[in-house]
Amino acid sequence: MKKMKSFLGLLLLVFLFSSCESGKNTAKDNSNIEKLEYKESMEKYNYDIVIPQIKGVENEDISYLNLSLQESARILIENIMGSADAGTKEAPVEAKMSYEIKENNFNILSIVVTTYTYQGGAHGITSIESYNINRKDYSLLNYDMIFDENAEDYFNMRMNDIITASRENNGSRKALNTDGKEVLFFDNAESNVKNTVMYFDGDNVVFLYPHYEIAPYSSGMPVFKFDKKDIKKYVKIKF
């Protein structure tokens, strides 16, 4: 009888262990973001590039994303090395690429990639890209996959209201840039949500405008945030 109880107990442990192991087969549990780094410092040029690589997920979207980021890094390095003659010891040409994972409550993996290049002149150029990934199946998401046809008018109206209020109050912290500083917009600035970089941060969807899109370089890159509860009726997918 004792042997039978021991045997049944062993079977139960095996079953529980197997159940736990099977739970790890989901893409979400197995996913792991690793850093891929490229770095070199020479007299006339330097680059410091760090890109994310999503491991443990096998689907076309993630494979495409990983390879695309590698290709972007390769092209950036080639361009910097190719323009090395424009650099000097005092002011070498340079390239930097980094990324940030935005923690949020939308069940979306938001990766924001920032690229900076300097190839001579008064200042360098900073650009930002985002990659939004559904954590349920690890498919890449874009604006039209997430929001319905009425969302565009809503977002543009709200952003234009902020732009107008900011202009009338000479900034007055109505709109801020990525550094948390006030934005002074162009006189003819008009919002277009389709021209923004979109990512998810906390309880907000964030729309970021690149340099010169609606504000001068000195004002940085304006950001507009919309709370999850305010945009719920425009969302097509379940978070």
PLM regions: where:
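Bacterial N-terminal signal peptides that target proteins for export
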Residues: 1-8
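C-terminal motif of bacterial Sec signal peptides marking the signal peptidase cleavage site
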Residues: 16-19
